[in-house]
């Protein structure tokens, strides 16, 4: 089977995480299926210099958020799972409560019901009790809550270094290794 991953980009700050995932996966020859929420489109326009077509060109397939009939909305369409990068608290809540009211949340629901890997790069701070409860629910359902916390031990020089390391670590949870996912070798004596 071809390696195939769904990339969801939802409306939290950090659109760059989704773009970096697409860039790293293209270099790994992984077939990507992209779905972008309306909130994510707003974040792209306000936080980045990326043009929509430039981002969409990084994916093998782009699915409109309203297309509930897309291939990724069915469990018979085999994937390695789904990465939502970034994941808004609205998307987290929808996934935690089984609301598949758009293609992004429907695809996440399908990934969970098929017992495939779902990784949510949640972007919010501070957290309230509803956020924590939703994270707990998703974890109990088999999903992975993965806040993109900077790894300062890597001595990042740029924001892109921080983004690349977080995304590479998230992709390693799917068994996808990238140059940015080097293993920690311990501290020098």
Curated annotation (Swiss-Prot):
SUPFAM superfamilies: Homo-oligomeric flavin-containing Cys decarboxylases, HFCD. InterPro entries: Flavin_trans-like (IPR036551), Flavoprotein (IPR003382), UbiX-like (IPR004507). Transmembrane segments: none annotated. GO terms for molecular function: carboxy-lyase activity; flavin prenyltransferase activity. The keyword tRNA processing does not apply. FMN binds at residues 11-13, 37, 88-91, 123. Dimethylallyl phosphate binds at residue 153. It comes from the Bacteria. The keyword Hydrolase does not apply. Keywords: Flavoprotein, FMN, Prenyltransferase, Transferase. Pfam families: Flavoprotein. It catalyses: dimethylallyl phosphate + FMNH2 = prenylated FMNH2 + phosphate. Its EC number is 2.5.1.129. Belongs to the UbiX/PAD1 family. Flavin prenyltransferase that catalyzes the synthesis of the prenylated FMN cofactor (prenyl-FMN) for 4-hydroxy-3-polyprenylbenzoic acid decarboxylase UbiD. The prenyltransferase is metal-independent and links a dimethylallyl moiety from dimethylallyl monophosphate (DMAP) to the flavin N5 and C6 atoms of FMN. This is Flavin prenyltransferase UbiX. It comes from Neisseria meningitidis serogroup B (strain ATCC BAA-335 / MC58). The gene is ubiX.
């Amino acid at each position: 089977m071809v390696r195939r991953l769904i990339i969801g980009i939802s409306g939290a700050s950090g659109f760059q995480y989704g773009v970096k995932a697409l860039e790293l996966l293209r270099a790994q020859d992984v077939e990507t299926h992209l779905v972008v929420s309306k909130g994510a489109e707003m974040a792209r326009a306000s936080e980045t210099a990326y043009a929509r077509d430039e981002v969409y060109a990084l994916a093998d397939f782009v699915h409109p958020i309203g297309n509930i009939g897309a291939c990724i909305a069915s469990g018979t369409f085999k994937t390695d799972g789904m990465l939502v990068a970034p994941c808004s608290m609205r998307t987290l809540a929808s996934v935690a409560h089984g609301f598949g009211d758009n293609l992004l949340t429907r695809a996440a629901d399908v990934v969970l019901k098929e017992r495939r890997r779902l990784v949510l790069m949640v972007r919010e701070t501070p957290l309230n009790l509803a956020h924590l409860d939703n994270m707990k629910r998703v974890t109990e359902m088999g999903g992975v809550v993965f806040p993109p916390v900077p790894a300062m031990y890597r001595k990042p020089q740029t924001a892109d270094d921080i983004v690349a390391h977080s995304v590479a670590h998230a992709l390693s949870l799917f068994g996808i290794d990238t140059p940015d996912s080097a293993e920690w070798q311990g501290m020098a004596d």
